A protein has these predicted regions:
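Sec-dependent N-terminal signal peptides of Gram-positive bacterial secreted proteins and lipoproteins
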Residues: 1-23
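Short hydrophobic alpha-helical membrane-anchoring segments
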Residues: 12-20, 68, 126, 256
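N-terminal targeting/tethering segments
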Residues: 19-110
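PPIase-associated folding chaperone regions across multiple families
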Residues: 24-26, 49-53, 103-151, 161, ...
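Low-complexity, repetitive regions of proteins mediating host interaction that are extracellular
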Residues: 85-92, 187-194, 290-291, 296-299
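Short, aromatic-enriched amphipathic alpha-helices that serve as compact interaction elements
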Residues: 155-163
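Peptidyl-prolyl cis-trans isomerase
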Residues: 162-203
């Protein structure tokens, strides 16, 4: 697919002219209000809006451009959005008045400007887990495993021996797991976001080529106590666990941000307005994908 650059330039935000690297608007000197001897122009209003909401508005415009390329509006989306509107009207008093107070003419505009884009955002995230599978595997190292949390290494070694003898993990867990164990031999998805398991265990599960018992006892500290763990790899084949990976990670803030960055890179996102550039540089440098040096850690 040909990459179409997404540029935040003069066309965005209804800009009609550029002065150097800073966007301006047509008729910027036209007075829109006065108070005493002070007058405010269209240019004053635009500059204020750009400074106060410019970055948010920029990214919303960019998202819409990405949705247009990646997630078409379907009949099913329209149906879901209409059902949401109907539900709001049934359960909220003065729904139409409320959305009008937010600046929407009617429920149809609210549906098109808010609800449908929200559905598109969800679909884009789901698509990301297919499009960026290599990135996800590299970053989050997902695998599905059956893990048993034991009180100490000695107990874990006994559990490991039972697993190697072919005993079902849940049966082994009943005998050897610590009281109130989080990991009791049931299938669970493990990723780098799983903070109560050791990095070594996560990496081992991710790299192991064949499903089965991992012949090692792992330890990790949790709430001031060190526990021992044994594990059985179920699968680390991405296509087999993708749905679980999506369910587990899709609402994570880092993943949501990474999703947007992925598509910004795909469409060569650039910012040509200095004010917006500076704002993004200060708050979300990772979105300035044409300048990866800005998002690099100082460490």
């Amino acid at each position: 697919m040909k990459k179409t650059p997404i540029l935040f330039v003069c066309a965005a935000m209804m800009l009609t002219g550029c002065s150097g690297a800073t966007a301006t608007i047509k008729d910027k000197d036209e007075t829109i209000m006065t108070i005493g001897d002070t007058k405010y122009t269209k240019g004053d209003e635009y500059d204020f809006l750009k400074i106060s909401t410019g970055t948010d508005l920029t990214m919303e415009l960019v998202k819409q451009a990405i949705y247009k390329q990646e997630v078409k509006v379907t009949k099913e989306m329209k149906k879901k959005a209409q059902e949401q509107v109907n539900n709001y009207k049934e359960n909220m008093e003065n729904f139409d008045e409320q959305i009008q107070s937010l600046g929407y003419k009617n429920s149809t505009q609210y549906m098109n400007k808010v609800l449908i884009p929200s559905l598109q955002a969800s679909e884009l995230t789901k698509k990301y887990f297919t499009d960026a599978k290599k990135d996800i595997q590299k970053t989050y190292k997902p695998s599905k495993a059956r893990i048993i949390q034991c009180e100490n290494k000695a107990t874990a070694k006994k559990a490991l021996k039972a697993l190697k003898n072919g005993t079902d993990p849940e049966e082994v867990a009943q005998q050897y797991m610590v009281d109130s164990a989080k990991y009791s031999g049931k299938e669970t998805l493990v990723t780098t976001k799983t903070t109560d398991l050791s990095t070594r265990l996560i990496n081992t599960l991710s790299k192991t080529k064949k499903a089965g018992v991992i012949d090692e006892v792992f330890t990790n500290e949790s709430s001031g106590t060190t526990y021992a763990y044994v594990a059985v790899l179920v699968s680390n084949t991405y296509k087999d666990i993708k749905d679980d990976v999506y369910t587990t990670l899709s609402s994570d803030d880092d993943v949501t941000k990474a999703c947007l960055v992925y598509y910004l890179k795909k469409y060569n996102f650039e910012v040509h307005d200095q004010d917006v550039f500076n704002n993004l540089k200060a708050n979300n440098p990772e979105y300035l994908v044409s300048r990866p040096d800005l998002s690099e850690s100082d460490d």
